[in-house]
């Protein structure tokens, strides 16, 4: 029985996550959550906490999944870090292209992180982990003599992580895959030898 309950817990959490993703945090009401998750308020609170706690659980689940995708670039042992940078930047925007929606973390950064410190800290911690992935790939590029000599990998990693959000914005507005791919190549060329 515990196995079934755990499955339902995760399944319902995914439903809530997609609802926050679709509607945003502020627009999503407890009534919306009850209706979509098919559980009542008296079950939501003891299981998931209040609406904000539920969002935190959803963000945690989402960020762990995305971070796992990013970290896969650290274990593949590629001999071309620049190609991995292109793949990393593509990963950051592919969801918008394929699923026609912006990254949940990016959405929450702009919707709620300015006014909620707890959520901002959670999103910031995740961003720092993503930057570590970029930094490791950039350092590999330096070792492979593919990246300009003297590049500050830590600052460049922060720049690449921020740039992926900017390119995501560009794609959402213009819906031009070719231009987005060109921007990614241009960004990588800026640091190439």
Task: Indicate residue ranges for each PLM-predicted region.
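N-terminal intrinsically disordered/low-complexity leader segments
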Residues: 1-7
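Generic hydrophobic, amphipathic alpha-helix propensity
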Residues: 8-19, 33, 58-62, 66, ...
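Amphipathic alpha-helical segments used for helix-helix packing
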Residues: 84, 97-118
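C-terminal peripheral helix-coil segments that are non-catalytic and often amphipathic
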Residues: 87-91, 95, 132, 136-140, ...
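Hydrophobic alpha-helical segments that form the core
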Residues: 149-170, 183-190
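Hydrophobic alpha-helical connector segments
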Residues: 57, 71-100, 153-160
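Helix-turn-helix
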Residues: 11, 19-53, 57
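Amphipathic alpha-helical packing segments from all-alpha helical-bundle domains
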Residues: 98, 117-143, 155
């Amino acid at each position: 029985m515990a196995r079934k309950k755990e499955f339902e817990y995760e399944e319902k959490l995914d439903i809530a996550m997609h609802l926050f993703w679709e509607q945003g945090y502020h627009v999503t009401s407890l009534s919306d959550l009850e209706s979509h998750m098919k559980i009542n308020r008296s079950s939501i609170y003891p299981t998931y906490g209040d609406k904000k706690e539920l969002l935190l659980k959803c963000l945690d689940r989402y960020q762990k999944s995305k971070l796992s995708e990013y970290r896969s670039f650290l274990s593949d042992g590629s001999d071309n870090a620049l190609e991995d940078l292109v793949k990393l930047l593509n990963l950051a925007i592919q969801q918008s292209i394929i699923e026609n929606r912006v990254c949940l973390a990016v959405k929450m950064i702009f919707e709620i992180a300015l006014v909620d410190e707890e959520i901002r800290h959670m999103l910031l911690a995740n961003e720092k982990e993503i930057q570590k992935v970029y930094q490791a790939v950039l350092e590999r590029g330096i070792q492979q003599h593919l990246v300009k000599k003297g590049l500050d990998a830590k600052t460049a990693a922060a720049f690449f992580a921020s740039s992926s959000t900017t390119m995501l914005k560009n794609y959402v507005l213009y819906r031009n895959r070719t231009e987005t791919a060109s921007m990614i190549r241009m960004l990588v060329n800026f640091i190439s030898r």
